[in-house]
Amino acid sequence: MAIKEIKAEEFNYSPFRLIGKDWLLVCAEADGKANAMTASWGGMGVMWGKNVAFLVIRPQRYTKEFIDGAEGFSLSVFGEERRKMMSYFGSVSGRDEDKLAKADLTPLQDAGRM
């Protein structure tokens, strides 16, 4: 699957659909380890002239520890054909297994891109 970079000013998708129906995959890396989870609560917009995305993540979630310890995080969108994988990321804890490896995903670090 190829990565498609979309500049924020060219982002022409409904955040209501992406977050509420299609879901997002949020991934963060801290201390040499990465973890991801399905995110379905949040929003996108502009605050004080800056493009922003925000997520609401329960404090008990293992992924929140990664986000809190990281300089940033990534948001990815996958097509309907990956719905089962997205459901897996939302139902299994990274405390128990390496979800990225099991889903055959490799995190790429490329700061400042969407």
Predicted regions and their residues:
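Active-site-proximal mixed secondary-structure blocks
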Residues: 1-114
